[in-house]
Amino acid sequence: PLSNSPKAKIKKQLFQPLTIIEVSIDVRHNASLHKITDARIAQPFTSIPFNPYKLSISIFIADFLNQALMREQADKPLFAYIQNSIEWLDNCDEGFANFHLVFMMRLSMFLGFYPNTDNYHAGSCFDLRSACFSGVVPMHNDYLKPAEASIVSLILRMSFANMHLFRLSRTERNRLIDIILHYYRLHLPSFGEMKSLEI
C-alpha cells in the first residue's frame, strides 16, 4: 500500500499524466537498464489534477503521445511545444474544450505531415494520405467529403489563443478525434489503438 507520508505523496505526483519531471540516472554502459537515482517534478501543476475535464484531456493526450512518439528521437523543439502546451492548459481558466484537437494537429508539424492548406476552397475534399485539400476526389477511400473537410480547415485556423471563438458540438468534436487519429495512423504505421476513454 502507498504511504501517506510527504515523500510518498511526491512520488504519486510523479505519475500524474503529462507531469514534467527531472531525473538523475546512473548510466552504466554495460547495462541494458539504467537506474534512476533521483526524480522530481520540474513544474508542479496548479489545476490539471484538480479539474476533471482537464484531467480527462491530459489522460487522452498522454495516451496519444505514447502512440505518436513511440519511434521519435530526442527533439528539443518538439519537447518545447509539448511542454508549452501542457503549461498553457494548466494555466488557462476557460475556453479549452478544443485543446486536444489543436494540440494534435499542431503536433503533426513536428512529425512532418501537417496538412497543406494552400489549395483549400469551399467544396474541397481533404486527402488524408497526401495531407492536402483538392477539388478532385482522390482514387482511394482515405479522404473527407467537403462538409468534413471544411471542419478540418477550421481546426487548422485555430490556435490556443483563439480556439474559444470556434464553437463545435460534442458530436463534431468526437468525429474530429476519429478523423485525426485515422490521419495519424495513415502517416505513422506504428500508431496503435488508444487505450484512454473518449473525451
Residue ranges of predicted features:
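Non-catalytic alpha-helical scaffolds and adjoining flexible linkers that form interface surfaces
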Residues: 1-199
